[in-house]
Amino acid sequence: MKKNLLPTLLSLVTASAVCAGEYHLLKEIPVGGDGGWDYLSVDSVGQRLYVSHGTKVAVIDIAKDMVAGEITNTPGVHGLAPAPDLARGFVSCGREDKCAIVDLKTLQIISKVDTGKNPDAMLYDPARQEVYMFNHTGGSATVIDAKAGKVIATVPLDGKVEFGAVDTKAERVFVNLEDKSELVAIDTKTHTVKKRWPIAPGEEASGLAFDEKNHRLFLGCGGSKTMVMMDSESGKVLASVPIGDGVDANSFDPATQLAFASCGDGTVTIAKEEGDKLTVVQTLKTEKGARTMTIDPATHKIYLASAKFSEPAAGQRRGKMQPGSFKVLVYGQE
């Protein structure tokens, strides 16, 4: 009987260890350089963090918490979608309306593919080995065969396209239309729009995260300053919680059932998913301007990009970025 209880006790201890403690700052990783930033993405297997910065992508070794290299010649970069199974990365180059395909071993660009106007967010569908480039001002999604490196479809979306998420089991890609306050569901087999769902009481959603097991979507809504939880099968809005100002990213940790919304006002709202309920459990103070974020599900750490700014002049929202101050903030429960 004692032997039968041991695995159960060990699993309970492990689960409690994962859930215990509030998030706090663990480390700052200096990156340096000048220019703005946008999305971050993690490759847990390769232990790499990809951070868009200026006209390049900074590559960080998250095992050592140090810069390991960079990917250059990516004008107007918004982010990189890693495809670990192909050892490739797909970079949205907003200023030249292209996707740069990168060899993740050498960090060299293999080729560039034409997209729609101003590709912004991006994602990789590992089940179909396809990449979606979401063209923010182009109002469409460019679908790329990740192996062949060729465009196979363009999906008209009719709106200002923001972040997306993929449900490989349901064969759907979800994406926010910020100006329409809608969530669109795309059929990944036919590359056509299947559903358009209103997100009310949410408004102007940008960030998006997905809980595949429980069929829940988490939308960061800047217009209403809320994080909305939606049923990914029916499109029904189940819950909504208040968040900070200037949200730009969402993440979800399946092990802890925690949803995160990072905001430019220097906060991350952390909420617990329990069935149809969503409850705020922590408001984490970060740094003003740290609006984009990603999570490493293997370690439960979240990463945010930030920099130091001078005092703003009269009538301005913020001051100038101090040269060489760009960094990545690492938060965890350790």
Regions found by a protein language model. Give the residues of each.
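Predominantly soluble domains enriched in secretory-pathway, periplasmic, or organellar proteins
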Residues: 19-334
